[in-house]
Amino acid sequence: MSQTVQVVFPCTEGQGAGLVAALKSALVETRAFEGCESVEVYTDADAPDRVVLWEKFAERANHEAYMAWRTETGLLEMLAPILTGELQITYFTDHPDI
């Protein structure tokens, strides 16, 4: 069963739109990463500097490998100056029978 993941980017004031623009090119690589099934980008309607990704990966291990790769390539470090804190990553269990 696929792994659903929510990743929240808590951006500093005024940086949400810039992050969304940067994600347009960065997510090309994400979507090509092994096990990635989909990625959707949202901004909080009441707090536009809170950017949320809803991702589906074949398995949690695929997402963990992806996050390790993003760390190794320096992307997360590059984003640090526009974030107010660490990424918030939540793994969800699907209940397709409900």
Which residues does each PLM region occupy?
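Short, surface-exposed ligand-recognition loops at beta-strand->loop->(often short) alpha-helix junctions
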Residues: P10-L19
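A general secondary-structure junction signal
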Residues: T43, Y91-T93
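A short acidic, often aromatic-flanked loop/helix-cap motif at beta-alpha or helix-coil junctions
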Residues: H95-I98
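Short, well-ordered beta-strand segments in beta-rich or mixed alpha/beta enzyme
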Residues: Q3-F9, E40-M67
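An amphipathic, aromatic/His-enriched active-site/gating alpha helix that lines ligand/cofactor pockets
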Residues: S25-E37, K56-I89
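Short, flexible segments with low predicted structural confidence
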Residues: M1-Q3, G18, E34-C36
